From Swiss-Prot:
Name by which UniProt lists this protein: Type II restriction enzyme MjaIII
Lineage: Archaea, Methanobacteriati, Methanobacteriota, Methanomada group, Methanococci
Protein family (similarity comment): Belongs to the DpnII type II restriction endonuclease family.
UniProt keyword annotations, A-Z: DNA-binding, Endonuclease, Hydrolase, Nuclease, Restriction system
GO biological process: DNA restriction-modification system
EC code: 3.1.21.4
InterPro entries: Restrct_endonuc_II_DpnII (IPR021191), Restrct_endonuc_II_DpnII-like (IPR007637)
Biological source species: Methanocaldococcus jannaschii (strain ATCC 43067 / DSM 2661 / JAL-1 / JCM 10045 / NBRC 100440) (Methanococcus jannaschii)
Pfam annotation, one family: DpnII
Length: 290
């Protein structure tokens, strides 16, 4: 293995078509609140908005639970600084009854956040469609987490297929010390009691255990240096405190171009580092089956 080869064959992205929006999650979120949004649709275009708002909340107090999502907030409690420089907290938990004073506060929320103008002046036609759009926008915040999941899934499919092809190999996804002991009877010594590995692969023929971590970095940052340092120490610990156990780090992404030195230090210290191209070319298979 050559360090320059690792750097020169890093991927720009691992995004797939289903990376951008998690439609299933959004549809499920909408389904939970759809009826209440339809109730609120009644307020669209109402001239005497405040009066209608009061009547609606008297009859259907449960609709307050969907107010936060109308301004792209997931919390059921919102605290703001009012005009008197005092903190004001509104709760949006389900209630069976609302007093006039409470409804007045919710009306103020509607008015001050611009929701009254949105509905009264027919700037939207349907709150279900509107919230669907809000959910799509909010879902983009989850993309960072999805990159990590994507990397795991790519490697998981590869390891799954490898284990099907080679009956001597077995694996655990999200492996802990206890899961490894339970499945293969191996007593691991680890640096942290709660240490979890993305994968553990056991070769029944050689009785060797492989502990695998995977990640992808499209951009730079201090996280890369910290990760390289952590895995360098982890590899050393595993090597010094266990027999027939090897740590493998599968990482990729152009972010490593901004942190070549920490990665090289880990490589030079003996950490087995692979990127996805190397996995595709069979290097992981070679290590696990040798």
């Amino acid at each position: 293995m050559n360090f320059e080869y690792i750097i020169n064959s890093l991927l720009e992205t691992i995004k797939t078509y289903n990376f951008f929006v998690d439609w299933e999650k959004i549809e499920n979120n909408i389904k939970k609140i759809e009826k209440r949004l339809h109730i609120l649709n009644y307020l669209i275009g109402k001239e005497n908005f405040k009066e209608e708002f009061f009547e609606l909340l008297k009859e259907y107090p449960e609709v307050i639970t969907v107010f936060p999502i109308l301004i792209a907030v997931r919390d059921n409690k919102i605290t703001i600084l009012n005009e008197n420089m005092e903190l004001e907290t509104l709760e949006f938990k389900e209630k069976k009854y609302l007093t006039d004073e409470e409804i007045e506060r919710y009306y103020k929320f509607f008015k001050e956040t611009g929701l009254e103008d949105l509905l009264k002046n027919r700037k939207i036609k349907n709150l279900v469609d509107y919230v669907f759009g809000v959910e799509v926008g909010m879902d983009t915040n989850a993309r960072k987490n999805r990159i990590g999941d994507l990397m795991e899934n790519i490697v998981k499919k590869y390891i799954e297929n490898l284990c099907k092809q080679n009956k001597n190999l077995d694996y655990i996804f999200q492996a802990t010390k206890d899961k490894i002991k339970q499945k293969w009877g191996i007593n691991l010594t680890l640096d942290k009691t709660n240490r979890k590995f993305d994968f553990a692969v056991f070769n029944k023929n050689t009785k060797k255990l492989y502990l695998i971590e995977v990640n992808f970095y499209s951009g730079g940052g201090s996280k890369l240096k910290a990760t390289a340092g952590e895995y360098r120490s982890l590899n050393e610990f595993i090597k010094n405190n266990n027999n027939n156990v090897q740590f493998i780090w599968i990482t990729d992404g152009k972010g490593w171009n901004t942190a070549k030195n920490p990665l090289k230090e880990s490589f030079n210290s003996g950490v087995v580092i692979l990127n996805l191209k190397m996995v595709k070319e069979g290097l992981l298979k070679e290590i696990l089956t040798q």
